Design a protein with these regions (language model features):
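Transmembrane and membrane-interface helices of multi-pass
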Residues: 2-178
Length: 179
């Protein structure tokens, strides 16, 4: 007897897309939302964090079966950077900036150990643990986002073009501004 099983193509899931968006948005948008709610900034930071965090969907769309690995690698980097920024905000009440990086690289080991002894607290540890727990929870909810083959490339390119390439092209070639 000859068996002719037809393997069903995986279907697109709005729920899977929603979890992927929430996961990638979490790392940059949480701090921006806190800054907005506290009244220190407008909505531009939230808008930019939502838009540019969506770029992390490109590898997820191109390689849907590897979403957990891709999200874990990207997530660890985003988690470390965003946790540092969140802790800085909790300690100083302002956003992390380039001038902070300059000061950090000019710091010697004595100053660094003094800083850690002054600002390392239970509050920071609890915030870091809660932040990490939410990130892990969101990661466990991730499922492959299947977009049919020709469209996954179109959608990925549209994201890249709309968020990166078009603004660069407009500023460089039309407005004649430096990048």
């Amino acid at each position: 007897m000859h068996s002719t099983e037809v393997q069903a193509k995986p279907l697109f899931s709005w729920k899977a897309l929603g979890w992927a968006l929430l996961y990638f948005w979490f790392f940059s948008t949480l701090l921006q939302a806190i800054i907005y709610i506290s009244g220190y900034s407008g909505t531009n930071g939230i808008r930019d964090s939502l838009l540019f965090s969506s770029l992390w969907l490109i590898p997820v769309f191109l390689f849907p079966k590897r979403i957990k690995i891709i999200a874990a690698v990207i997530g660890v980097v985003l988690w470390a950077a965003s946790l540092a920024a969140l802790c800085y905000y909790v300690i100083y009440g302002q956003e992390f900036s380039q001038s902070v990086l300059f000061v950090m690289f000019e710091t010697n080991t004595n100053e660094a150990s003094e800083y850690l002894s002054q600002y390392f607290s239970l509050k920071i540890v609890l915030i870091a643990l809660a932040y990490t727990a939410v990130a892990v929870l969101l990661w466990t909810r991730l499922r492959p986002v299947y977009i049919p083959k020709p469209w996954r490339y179109v959608v990925s390119f549209a994201l890249l073009y709309g968020l990166i390439l078009h603004p660069i092209a407009m500023n460089t070639f039309i407005k004649k501004q430096a990048v």
